[in-house]
Each structure stands twice: as C-alpha cells, then as structure tokens.
Amino acid sequence: ADEVAMLDSQIRRYNAEGSLNMQLVVNEPNAFGRSLMAHYGKFRNVTNYIALTGPKSNDTEAKLGYYGEKIVLEAQKAGLNTCWVGLSFSKKNTSIDIPDGNKLYALIAIGHGAESGATHRIKTPQQISDDYATAPDWFKRGVDYALLAPTALNQQKFHFQWLGDNRVKASRGIGFFTKMDLGIACCHFELGAGIPIYWQ
C-alpha cells in the first residue's frame, strides 16, 4: 500500500508538471499476455504498470521519457524493479482510460524482480558528445549519467552539446522510441550535472 501511494503521488506530481496523463494500474494481468515477461525473465507475474499516456503532440514522447524515468528512479529507491516496455504489450487488453486527444505510448512494468538487471554495453562519452573533453565537469558528469540511462534496444541514439553557461543542446538520432529515450537521457543528465540545465 505504501508503494502504491508513493507511485500515485509521483504520477500526480509529474502529470501536473508535464501536462501528461500517466496512470498507475495495479493487479491487472492482461496487458502483457503470456509472452513478454516469459521472454525477458525479469519479473514474476507482472500485473502492475504505469501507462504512459499523454496528448498527441510532438513533444509528448520526450516528456513521458523524462518524467517517467523520474518515477522509475523513485520506484527503484523503494526497492521495486522496473522495465520500460515499448512494443511487447497488448494495447487492447490494458485497462486504462485514454481521454480524447491522448494516446498510449508505452508502459513501465513494475514489480519485485526475480533478479537484478544486468549492465548493458554502452557507448563512450566521446561518442555522444563532441564537447566532452573541453566542457566543464558538471557537463561531463551529465554525459556520464546519461550513458547509464535505459534505452530501447540499448541503442543510445542521443547527443549532447555544451553551448556555454548552463545551456545544453540535446538531440536524437533516427529509430524506434528515440524521442522517449532522449527524455530519459535528459533526466539522467540533470541528475549527474547537479545544476539547473537550460535545454536548447
């Protein structure tokens, strides 16, 4: 109950900040069918998830990535395991309310994992930032943290450029879920930098 209350509180907060419509669904076994978690082997009996819903607009996916990852990090602090799920779920079997003008973009599965997640191969800092060698320490920390962010298929198709002062340009490559991945990476970048970032 405490975990549900914590997640509900986080979701309400970030929905308000981001003008989103994320929803927590508990004890609902149908969204994943039989295939997803059997393939990944990460959770036992997943019936809880956050539905990442928001307006049909260009910036929604990045915002869902950014705010969704904030919730993920809080959930992990509370001892929960999480998994971003972009494709392997059944939209028709989810029991969520999608308002007019909104769309379901992805889910975050939440549960008590059978095992801890593994570390995946990552790019080097220089591969995602041409400014890494000459930028301030806070920027380097941001890049280092961004490389720890989960991305679809571990593709890490994002790039950070230091523009002087606290200004940073974040851009993405082409591919599935790169908008959401960029939002997740920006969340990690801010954590690493430890200072307010003015995104350009």
Question: Can you say where each PLM-predicted feature lies in the sequence?
Answer:
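Acidic, surface-exposed loops and disordered segments
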Residues: 1-200
